[in-house]
Amino acid sequence: MNKGVMRPGHVQLRVLDMGKALEHYVELLGLIEMDRDDQGRVYLKAWTEVDKFSVVLREADEPGMDFMGFKVVDEDSLNRLTDDLLNFGCLIENVAAGELKGCGRRVRFQAPSGHHFELYADKEYTGKWGVSEVNPEAWPRDLKGMAAVRFDHCLLYGDELQATYELFTEVLGFYLAEQVVDADGIRLAQFLSLSTKAHDVAFIHHAEKGKFHHASFFLDTWEDVLRAADLISMTDTSIDIGPTRHGLTQGKTIYFFDPSGNRCEVFCGGNYNYPDHKPVTWLAKDVGKAIFYHDRVLNERFMTVMT
C-alpha cells in the first residue's frame, strides 16, 4: 500500500580523502558536483535527476554509509509517517531544514537492521543537468566518465531482517519484489521496492548491524556497462566482479570500489514489477546463480567485504 514514500532521494557516504573521492565519483562515475557546505561535505547528482543532489560525501576516519534518504510526496505525508514510525517503536530525530543544503526538514530513524534512514518532502528543484526543460536534447555533451544516469538503490547488510521487513512494508509502504530463503523458509535476503523498479533498497542477513554493501547507479545499456568496465581498467580502479548478470533482479552489472573501500555498482536493465506480481523467490542453495547468473559461484569478496 502506498504510504506517501516516493523514491530514493540521497545517500551520505563517508570517504577517507575527499580529493580522491571526487576523482572517483565525478571523473570516473560521472556525477556532477552541485555544492559544498561549511562542514566540508560535497553534494553530487546524476544528470537526469531533477533535485539538487543525490549523493553527499563526508570526509571521515572510516568509510561507510551515514544514512539513506527517501523523498515523500508532501509535508502531510511526512507528518503522518513520523507518527507511524513512532507507533512502530522507532526513535525519531528531527533534522532542521538547511542542515543539508537545499533540503527541507528531515525525519531520521534507525531500522532494526542498524541502518539510519531519513524521510523528507522538500529539496531544491534544479531540473536535469545540462538540458533544457523545453525541447531538451537527448543528453548533455560534456558528461564525464561513465555518465551515470541516476542514483538507483543501496544494498545493506544487517540482522533482524523480519523486523526491518515489517517496518518497510507496513509503515513505509514498500513491497517485496524478490527474496532468498533457506531450507526452512527463513528469508536471508529481501529486495524491496516502492515502484515498478526491481528494488529501491535491499537487505541481506548479516550478524553485524548497520553495514554498507554498495550504492548503485543506473546506466542505459549493456554497452554502457562494458564501457564502464573499460574505464575501470583505464583508471586502475579496484574491481569486485563483472561485467556479468544477476539472476536476482536480472540486472546486467559491474561492481568496483572507491578509493576509501566503499563499493559502487553500475548496471542496466532489471526486472519490472506491478502490484499484481508475486515476489520472485530464490533458494539459498542456489544463491550462486541468483547473484552471479553466469558464473553460478559466489565471489567471496562480494559477500564479505563491506563498510
UniProtKB/Swiss-Prot annotation:
Alphabetically ordered keywords of this record: Aromatic hydrocarbons catabolism, Dioxygenase, Iron, Metal-binding, Oxidoreductase, Plasmid, Repeat
Pfam family, one: Diox-like_N
Example GO molecular function: ferrous iron binding
Reactions mediated catalytically: catechol + O2 = (2Z,4E)-2-hydroxy-6-oxohexa-2,4-dienoate + H(+)
Domain of life where this protein originates: Bacteria
Family matches, as InterPro entries: Catechol_2-3_dOase (IPR017624), Glyas_Bleomycin-R_OHBP_Dase (IPR029068), Glyas_Fos-R_dOase_dom (IPR004360), VOC (IPR037523), Xdiol_ring_cleave_dOase_1/2 (IPR000486), XylE-like_N (IPR054560)
Name listed for the protein in its UniProt record: Metapyrocatechase
Entry similarity comment: Belongs to the extradiol ring-cleavage dioxygenase family.
Organism of this sequence: Pseudomonas putida
Assembly information from the UniProt record: Homotetramer.
Cofactor(s) needed: Fe(2+)
Any GO BP annotation: benzoate catabolic process via hydroxylation
Residue ranges of domain VOC in the record: 7-122, 150-269
Disulfide bond annotation, renumbered to this chain: none
